[in-house]
Amino acid sequence: MASLSTTSLSFKAPSTTISQVLRKASSSQSVTFGRFTSSTKSLRLQISCAAKAETVQKVSDIVKEQLALAADVPLTAESKFSALGADSLDTVEIVMALEEKFNISVEESDAQNITTIQEAADLIEDLVQKKPAAETS
């Protein structure tokens, strides 16, 4: 008998509600279909949203300062550092300034993935949320 493990859900009946799905997903159960066994032992529901406008604005201000951009240069959350003239050293300096401003530590692997103001703001909010309570006070 073959065994198949999965972490995804398929909705076939339009009458299925979110609460029914969450109840079913939170319990540990196995369902057998002929030769295949599907087990839902662990399922996480992850909801993410864009960073707060305040965080995006603070990141924009730091980017303008680090890149010595004129005050009238328009920046949006989608503005790419490279399109603003930033090279790899500029990006490192931006990340260092963000770490100092928000009192966070950005892993090198995360820093290399930051290419836009929005990505930086999202990462900052994620790191701030994960900080222990003692560090945030």
Curated annotation (Swiss-Prot):
Residues 53-128 form the Carrier domain. The modification O-(pantetheine 4'-phosphoryl)serine is found at residue 88. It is found in: Plastid, Chloroplast. Residues 1-48 form a transit peptide. 4'-phosphopantetheine is transferred from CoA to a specific serine of apo-ACP by acpS. This modification is essential for activity because fatty acids are bound in thioester linkage to the sulfhydryl of the prosthetic group. InterPro entries: ACP, ACP-like_sf, ACP_chloroplastic, PP-bd_ACP, Ppantetheine_attach_site. Disruption phenotype: Small and chlorotic plants with altered cuticule and reduced levels of fatty acids in leaves. Transmembrane segments: none annotated. Keywords: Chloroplast, Fatty acid biosynthesis, Fatty acid metabolism, Lipid biosynthesis, Lipid metabolism, Phosphopantetheine, Phosphoprotein, Plant defense, Plastid, Transit peptide. One of its GO terms (biological process) is fatty acid biosynthetic process. One of its GO terms (molecular function) is acyl carrier activity. Induction: By light. Down-regulated by sucrose in the dark. One of its GO terms (cellular component) is chloroplast. Pfam families: PP-binding (PF00550). Coiled coil: none annotated. HAMAP family: Acyl_carrier (MF_01217). Carrier of the growing fatty acid chain in fatty acid biosynthesis that plays a major role in the biosynthesis of fatty acids in leaves. Required for the biosynthesis of chloroplast photosynthetic membrane lipids such as monogalactosyldiacylglycerol, digalactosyldiacylglycerol and phosphatidylglycerol. Is essential for the biosynthesis of the cuticular wax and cutin polymers in leaves, and for the establishment of systemic acquired resistance (SAR). Belongs to the acyl carrier protein (ACP) family. This is Acyl carrier protein 4, chloroplastic. It comes from Arabidopsis thaliana. The gene is ACP4.
